[in-house]
Structures are given as C-alpha cells and as structure tokens.
C-alpha cells in the first residue's frame, strides 16, 4: 500500500468544523471594515524576494530566518509572503492608487513564516490587514485603533484584550537612540544571551523585545526611547493619546514596544491578551510613512495593522463561544415514500427562494424515517420537515421542532412563514 501523503508541518487543513467557526468571525470583521469605508484588495501570495528585503529590512528575523524563498525556473528569487503590507504597497504603486490619493484598503489571506509551530502560531497562518494611505495626522491613527476596538465589542472579547501604545519617532531619532542603547548594552555584554548579542549591532531595538528576564532587568536602567523623540513625533503621539482618551479607549504606554519590522515610524501599537495562557499579540500595527518612497513611489503617509486570525478564533472560542454557530443547518427536509423525492426538492427550492438565509439540507440516499431523523440530529438541525406520500398528495408538510417534539402540519406554501416564526 502506498504511503499516505500528509500536510506539511505547520500548514494545516481547515475542516468544515473549523471553517464554521471562522466564517462568522470573518463576516463580522468585514462588516466593520465596510462601515469605516475600507475597500478590499486581493494580492498574490508570491512576490519577488527583494520586495520583502527592502520593506521589512534585511537584518530582521523575518528575512534572515523565517521566509520561504526559492528560485523559479527562470532563476528569479521569489518568496511566499510573510506579511501583507509590502505587497499592498507594491500593488498601490504599480497601479497608481497612491499618488496624491487617499486610500483605505483591506486584505485577508494566508501568510508564511518558517517558525516553530505552536498553538495559534503556524508556518502557514492567516491575517486580516488594513492599510490607510495619504493621511498624516494622529486622527487616522486613532480611528484605526477605534475600529479595532469596535471589532472586540462586536465579537464579545473586549474585556480580554488590552492596548499597548508607543511612539518610535523619526528615523533620525531612532538612529540617535540606537547609538545610546548600544553604548549602554556594551557595558553588559557578558549578561546578554546569544540572541541579544546578535541583535545588539544588527538591530538593537529588537533587544527591547527580549523575553529573557535577566535582559529585561538590565533594560530597566537603559536609555528610554521617549527621551530621544523629535518634537514632531512627540506632538503626534500626544495628539493620538488625547484622541484616544476622548474616545474612551483605555491604553498603556509601553516604551519597549518597537515592532519587529523596520518600516515603522512614530505610532506603533499592539492589542494583547492573557486569556490564551502566556501573553500573546492579537493585532498589531503602526505608521510607516517612509515605505512607499522606499519601494519606488512618491512620498506618502501611511498607517496600518494586521491581525492573526488563528489566535483571534482561539480567543473567541475561549471567552465568547456563544458568538459561534452551534449547528451546521437550521432545517432538515425528510422525504420517504413513492414520488416524494422530487416533491421534496421542489419544496426546498421554494423555501430557499422565500428565505435566502435559511440553512436547509435535504435528505438524499434514502432511508426510513428513523434513519433520516438520526441524520437531522447529526447535522444539528432545529427543525425537521417531513414529506410522506400523504403530504405530497395533500400539498402539506409536517413541521417538527426536534428539541421539544412539537409538530404541526401546514400547507406547503405556508411553510416559509412558519419557519421564519419558529427560527426567529
């Protein structure tokens, strides 16, 4: 017997039981995006490798260790996208969407990073991202944070996420801070772990992200990024904080929050949760005003964020399972007897015409009434419609509530009205 071929480690199949959980969450996210005026853009999952090296930064964990990069048959270096912002900017430049224009775009789909698979973090994972181009003020930063806060309310998880906020200033301010931080860390090289030693010269701000308790203790006395902020960045951040205060958005200023991609400037933020065990990031983003020009476009202000859907689904499951569907179908249509199958199919189509959102499954494959009722239970139906030979002849249908056992017989042309009442 041939050996079974299995999915690649860290790249998962999402079975019907999984997609049933994802679909209502995705629908809620998209509805909120539409209410803020965002438009969908669909992007390739494969891009030229230089795009990510230029955008993310060559001296980052993503580029150095995590990207899936390969040569195609023409010898071109291609990469499975590890994140969505770079591709969105590339598309905006290529199609003339960004020059002297305001754009609000969103995308959703798989991303790829070669990391150690663990709960909520996989090598193929899914993100929803949103990007705003052409607006420079703190007001749009505040609005995208308010939009994410609305998501948490809609999904019923607002009490389980907290907002962390920081400003990393301009490129020049970060360069000055970088020098000060390196000078400080050099005094304690013997206390740094291997990862921090590597980052100290290549990307020292990433040392601030270290989870090593000994390094965290060292950083308590390190220079603070806020001490090096330029005046414009400080004013921008103060304006953002005032707007969030006025909107009632609770946040914590975390001066060690820097984000792992080189293109960020000024505002950076993360929504984090502790409801899945150790603290994890659910949604993160910030401002990247230099990226469009860096990738060949005209200088364009930009801000955006991305959210990991795997972790979001886990969080909704953990703290608000009532948001998720408990059954696959609402109504199961049972038919048994001579000539009942075609009548059942006609009735099913009539009901779908009358009730477009009704989840109705018709029994196929025969079987007596007992077996068909068992199938209705298996699919989680609330109501069974029963057509026997007598119902077909009389133009009626039996409507049975499976939880209570109550049933009534109505004319087939009245079935839609009754179902709408019973299902609420």
UniProtKB/Swiss-Prot annotation:
UniProt catalytic activity: tRNA(His) + L-histidine + ATP = L-histidyl-tRNA(His) + AMP + diphosphate + H(+)
Primary location group: cytoplasm
Class of this enzyme: ligase
One BP term from GO: histidyl-tRNA aminoacylation
Pfam families found in the cross-reference section: HGTP_anticodon, tRNA-synt_His
EC number annotated for this UniProt entry: 6.1.1.21
GO MF terms, alphabetically ordered: ATP binding; histidine-tRNA ligase activity
PROSITE patterns: AA_TRNA_LIGASE_II
Places the protein is found: Cytoplasm
Keyword terms, alphabetized: Aminoacyl-tRNA synthetase, ATP-binding, Cytoplasm, Ligase, Nucleotide-binding, Protein biosynthesis
Source species, domain of life: Bacteria
Cellular component GO terms held in the UniProt record: cytoplasm
Complexes and interactors: Homodimer.
PANTHER family: HISTIDINE--TRNA LIGASE, MITOCHONDRIAL-RELATED, HISTIDYL-TRNA SYNTHETASE
Family, similarity comment: Belongs to the class-II aminoacyl-tRNA synthetase family.
HAMAP family according to UniProt: His_tRNA_synth
Name listed for the protein in its UniProt record: Histidine--tRNA ligase
Organism from which the protein derives: Edwardsiella ictaluri (strain 93-146)
Lineage of origin: Bacteria, Pseudomonadati, Pseudomonadota, Gammaproteobacteria, Enterobacterales
């Amino acid at each position: 017997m041939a050996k079974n071929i299995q999915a690649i480690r860290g790249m998962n199949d999402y079975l019907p039981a999984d997609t049933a959980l994802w679909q209502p969450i995705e629908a809620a996210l998209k509805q909120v995006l539409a209410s803020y005026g965002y438009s969908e853009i669909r992007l390739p999952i494969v891009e030229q490798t230089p795009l990510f090296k230029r955008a993310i930064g060559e001296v980052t964990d993503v580029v150095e260790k995590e990207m899936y990069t390969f040569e195609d048959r023409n010898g071109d270096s291609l990469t499975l996208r590890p994140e969505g912002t770079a591709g969105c900017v590339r598309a905006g430049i290529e199609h003339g969407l960004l020059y002297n224009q305001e754009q609000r775009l969103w995308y959703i789909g798989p991303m790829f990073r070669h990391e150690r698979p663990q709960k909520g973090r996989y090598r193929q994972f899914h993100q929803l991202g949103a990007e705003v181009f052409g607006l420079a003020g703190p007001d749009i930063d505040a609005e995208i944070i308010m939009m994410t806060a609305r998501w948490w309310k809609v999904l019923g998880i607002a009490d389980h996420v907290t907002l962390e906020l920081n400003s990393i200033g301009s490129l020049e301010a970060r360069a000055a801070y970088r020098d000060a931080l390196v000078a400080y860390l050099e005094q304690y090289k013997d206390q740094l772990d291997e990862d921090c030693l590597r980052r100290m010269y290549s990307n020292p701000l990433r040392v601030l992200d270290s989870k090593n308790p000994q390094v965290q203790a060292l950083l308590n006395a390190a220079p603070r990024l806020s001490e090096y902020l330029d005046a414009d960045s400080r004013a921008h951040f103060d304006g953002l904080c005032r707007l969030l205060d006025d909107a009632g958005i609770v946040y914590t200023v975390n001066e060690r929050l820097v984000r792992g991609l080189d293109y960020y400037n000024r505002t950076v933020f993360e929504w984090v949760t502790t409801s899945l065990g150790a603290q994890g990031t659910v949604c993160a983003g910030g401002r990247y005003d230099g990226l469009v020009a860096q990738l060949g476009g005209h200088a364009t202000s930009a801000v955006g964020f991305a959210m990991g859907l795997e972790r979001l689904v886990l969080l909704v499951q953990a703290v608000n399972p009532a948001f998720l569907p408990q059954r696959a179908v609402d109504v199961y249509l049972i038919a048994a007897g001579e000539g009942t199958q075609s009548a059942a199919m006609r009735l099913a189509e009539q009901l779908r015409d009358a009730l477009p959102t009704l989840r109705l499954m018709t029994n196929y494959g025969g079987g007596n009434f007992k077996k068909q009722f068992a199938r209705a239970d298996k699919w989680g139906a609330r109501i069974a419609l029963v057509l026997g030979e007598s119902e077909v002849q009389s133009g009626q249908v039996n409507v049975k509530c499976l939880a209570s056992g109550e049933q009534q017989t109505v004319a087939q042309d009245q079935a839609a009205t009754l179902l709408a009442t019973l299902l609420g």
